[in-house]
């Protein structure tokens, strides 16, 4: 903000012109920091910066100047990538730190699982055994239905009460599987082939 006895703003000083009272650069480029405007002028040009500032509302101009100064400094440091290089570097660093955090959390979880009391692991084994028995029972019921459709005599044996147990014993399961294989070996498919 030029006037009698006051020094011109950094922009007017660098461009060697008289600083008017309504100079758009004066509030943002003070005379005591000439490097700030010099770098912005070098990268963007004074006329482009002036146009940008005039298109913005007054309350956003200070933030715009700060962004222009940051981008100009980044462009001088890295002429190819500018501030995009810094952003990419930081995003890459965030990704690496997130991976390290995930690995650390997985290690903590493993250590916690190793330090659990053996009672809980015994309880889990019992639950697995019960699930295994339920699976065998379910498999037995499926085999019974298949056998009932294929062999009326075996269905009669089931309905007459020869197999009254709710839980299938291993020997009865093996007997049923052998009977099914003998009845129609071509219809049997293995789950593991």
UniProtKB/Swiss-Prot annotation:
Alphabetized PROSITE patterns for the sequence: LOB
Boundaries of every LOB domain copy = 7-108
Q: In which tissues is it expressed?
A: Expressed predominantly in roots, and at low levels in shoots, floral stems and open flowers.
Which terms under GO biological process does the entry name?
A: leaf morphogenesis; shoot system morphogenesis
Gene Ontology terms for molecular function = DNA binding
Q: Tell me which domain of life the UniProt entry assigns to the organism this sequence originates from.
A: Eukaryota
An example of a Pfam family matching this protein is LOB
Q: Does the entry annotate any disulfide bonds, and if so which pairs?
A: none
Q: What family, per the record?
A: Belongs to the LOB domain-containing protein family.
A further note on this protein reads: Gain-of-function mutant pck1-D (T-DNA tagging) shows highly epinastic leaves, reduced apical dominance and sterility.
Protein name, please? LOB domain-containing protein 12
